[in-house]
Amino acid sequence: MKASNKLSISSNYLPAGDQPNAIKKLCEGLKSKKFNQVLLGVTGSGKTFTMAKTIEELQRPALILAPNKTLAAQLYGEMKTLFPNNAVEYFVSYYDYYQPEAYVARSNTFIEKDASINEQIDRMRHSTTRSLFERKDVIIVASVSCIYGIGPVENYSKMILDISNKDNIDRIDLIKTLVSLRYKRNDHNFNRGNFRVLGDVIEVFPSHLEDRAWRIDLFGEEVDSITEFDPLTGHKLNNLENIKVYANSHYITNKPTLDQAIIKIKNDLEIRIKEFKLEGKLIEAQRIEERTNFDIEMMEISGTCSGIENYSRYLTGRLPGKAPPTLFEYLPNETILFVDESHVTIPQINGMYKGDFSRKSNLSEFGFRLPSCKDNRPLKFEEWDKMRPETVFVSATPSDWEMNQTYGEFVEQIIRPTGLVDPICRVKPATNQIDDIIGECKETIKKGFRCLITVLTKKMAEDLTEYMNDLGLKVQYMHSDIDTLERIEIIQDLRKGNYDILIGINLLREGLDIPECALVAICDADKEGFLRSHRSLIQTIGRAARNVNGKVILYADKMTNSIKTALKETERRRKKQIIWNKEHNIEPKSIIKNINNIIELDVKKDSNEEDSILKDSKHNINKYMKELKKEMLEAASELKFERAAEIRDEIKKIENKELGI
């Protein structure tokens, strides 16, 4: 039976502005089984708080879908703060680095799969699925990568080791079961996903826990006691009556299923070899035979192989072309789906399958993989649309697709509780725009505020950064070549004042919380296209809407339809907010937000020394982490548990900072 903790917000704030009405309408819609709703909420109107209050009001689990890891981390931090006593989980891609296997036919180049898995995110993914099995008060924040396949819920749910006090269990059987759940025996280096055996005592480090492990004491063939302990110091934490050990992999498969899968793989391999030989493709026939037989041999010996996900169709028993199992199959029926920044997230979901299919087709065509590899894929948009639960699309600029789902209806959240008004927008000639921008930036910086400049190309971003640097301005650029973690650090540095100006292309739009920003300059605003559509312009204008002194300058030599639409909508919102402020006697105030909230959760920097350590080690953070872990284990082996615990806490801080949560 699932735990039924009440979903309860811990906050001194009450809904204000348009929030009470938005919460009421969303709840009424969901109670009346309205499948699609749109929350049109402007920047700074408290859309996250509205989502949270809706979840609390309805007491239903929720999945919040974000377009990227940066925004997912930000949302996770906010939800974790709002719901401290509930299961707020984080489900994003666990790859720090991922190079998928691929074949480039024109140069006859095969690129092997290369990946680096982030252990912390892997733990959080396991924590997510465990919470879905055991609790009702679950809020999951996920990136769009959650539409990629994981192991089927029916297999995962069967592979759970349930142990209670006084249970009869054979020691050897217990060890075999742990191995079948993909736990590794390691009596010396005890980490997450391992177990160790000390006589009649078996210690397990569960896949979902970070700093706690379980000790099972056997007396003969009876469970004498179960305790929770600190794996680093060995200190006992709690006595437990019952534990459930979940598999150490979402791709877990029991032996009978694996045996059946291998038979099917062998049959399909024979068919594929014949096909290649009939087409005169002898190299491809030999290649597919060698590679697949090697994988089969590994599966027979160890129960898995490198790239086992390419055989997911056989392991799940699904027919060719059927939707892969994803996180959506783990969700309870009453789950609410919130699609944040839906105007960006929906197109991403729509495009993920096509890119993946092209690469897999090449691998299959040239004998590197069986055709079944094409079924290891993200959901097609139509599949996702069919299986998603009741949905609220959240955006300041919802696209036509979302509006069509609701037949043009939407819940509007224009009024900001802070009284902040949409920024004043001015249009200036694009001629000599750089000189004018520099002058505007200098004026803004004098007042202690930050500036955002959006341009059209990476080269322009880099060149303008170099030019402004030469003029003595503290400036940095940010575009898609900058990795996620570095982007988070750049934003934090901007807020701290290490930079005064940030130049970007398409990343200075959705969801960036920079209350210190008082100037947004849009270069070449009259160049019609995706980057200068009315939706893009409205989103970019919104970056200055968190500061009472915010202003936006659009540099254009002609008034395009997009500019006219964006300015008209911004002015409509300004007027509505001004009227509300007068009626309620509200003086607008800039949003005040703790700088650390953008990049970390529950992480307090104890000293400047730690920051300098991180900065010095940034170029080789993995090496530094290994050194710390080695030092921690050495301290523990020397029984210096207090020192070991201090190092462990430092490792946690760095991991959280690296994750951006």
Model-inferred region functions:
Residues 32-38, 60-61, 137, 449-450:
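Pre-Walker A (Motif I) flank of P-loop NTPase domains
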Residues 482-505:
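Conserved helicase ATPase core of P-loop NTP-dependent helicases/translocases
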Residues 59-81, 87-96, 456-459:
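Conserved Walker A/P-loop ATP-binding site and its immediately adjacent core
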Residues 38, 84-94, 307, 450-452, ...:
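Conserved RecA-like helicase motor-core motifs
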Residues 32-54:
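Walker A/P-loop
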Residues 1-40:
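Conserved pre-motif I regulatory segment
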Residues 38, 91-446, 458, 465, ...:
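N-terminal cationic and glycine-rich segments that engage phosphates or anionic surfaces
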Residues 73-81, 101-103, 463-467:
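Short amphipathic alpha-helical segment within the helicase RecA-like ATPase core
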